[in-house]
Amino acid sequence: GTVFNTVGSDILAILCRQIGIPLYVLTPMIKVDTRPVYGYNRLSPMPFDYGPRLAGAWDMEAKERVDFRGIKLLEIAPEYIRSLITEKGIIPSSAFFHEAMEYARFLEEV
């Protein structure tokens, strides 16, 4: 049930928990990453260089004075998530691991 999402999603998750509003995450099952089960470790949080996107037209001298490094995706722990809404239905975060592994097996058969 762990989710990786854009910057600010972590703050929203904490806020929702604090004020008692359930957090739902929309995601297609195809985005589920089961590689960690097999030993692959994903970097968390994911670093990202925003320079090309934010300062593509800047002159080089101006670009060199600004640090554009940031984080692209942050981890949101399952305890902050009520359920994930997918094409397979609404899945509680506590049940998502089982559904993800089932979906991964389905993809291997296709």
Language-model segment annotations:
Residues G1-E109:
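Conserved phosphate- and dinucleotide-binding cores of soluble alpha/beta proteins
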